[in-house]
């Protein structure tokens, strides 16, 4: 007796109600598989859209930094599961969105603004950011400024000081966006020193770019 005819005999011997239950279960399994593929595809699309934000960098499942997102990209940030947006530049310069706080809150995300002077960043600025991160360290957070210069520097410091990321790895991520100038090199070194951390690492070059 071949396999097909064997299956026919087995199903014929089963009660009709049981056959119906087995059929529904099989349909449900197929639906779940198809649904799972759909969810994965949607998440992948959202991730790709996040990469369209200026200089977007993802450090962990709950922490990323970027330059200034557009109004439309704020919705993408929300759809990608972010719960908090921290902005560390002035709201009156460049591509800043003056009403960003209102837009972010309207989308159901938390918003924190720490206006950091690019020409005079302070340890207090960084500590304000770090304190907020430490209070709710599990909240998925996007840190941003205008072009992700301030934000990558703050991200470098936070990851090295609070997440024990090797200096070389964190510096490589920062340098993929920019090389800090003398003001920011001095700032980074002072924050590291205040937290008993060294900027030195094998292969690290902290040379500053030539002034333009």
Regions found by a protein language model. Name each.
Residues 2, 27, 31, 35-141, ...:
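Cys-dependent protein tyrosine phosphatase-like superfamily
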Residues 3-26, 35:
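Bacterial N-terminal signal peptides that target proteins for export
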Residues 141-154:
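A phosphate-binding catalytic loop at a beta-strand-loop-alpha-helix junction
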């Amino acid at each position: 007796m071949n396999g097909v005819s064997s299956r026919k005999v087995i199903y014929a011997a089963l009660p009709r109600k049981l056959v119906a239950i087995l059929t529904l279960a099989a349909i449900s399994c197929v639906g779940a598989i198809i649904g799972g593929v759909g969810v994965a595809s949607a998440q992948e699309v959202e991730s790709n859209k996040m990469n369209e934000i200026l200089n977007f960098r993802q450090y962990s499942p709950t922490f990323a930094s970027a330059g200034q997102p557009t109004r439309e990209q704020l919705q993408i940030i929300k759809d990608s599961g972010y719960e908090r947006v921290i902005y560390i530049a002035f709201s009156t310069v460049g591509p800043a969105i003056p009403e960003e706080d209102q837009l972010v809150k309207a989308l159901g995300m938390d918003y924190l603004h720490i206006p950091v002077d690019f020409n005079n960043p302070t340890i207090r600025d960084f500590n304000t950011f770090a304190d907020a991160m430490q209070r709710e360290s599990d909240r998925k957070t996007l840190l941003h400024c205008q072009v992700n210069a301030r934000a990558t520097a703050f991200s470098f410091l936070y990851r090295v000081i609070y997440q024990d990321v090797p200096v070389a790895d964190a510096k490589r991520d920062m340098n993929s966006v920019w090389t800090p100038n003398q003001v920011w090199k001095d700032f980074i070194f002072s924050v590291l020193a205040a937290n008993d951390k060294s900027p030195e690492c094998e292969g690290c070059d902290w040379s500053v770019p030539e002034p333009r």
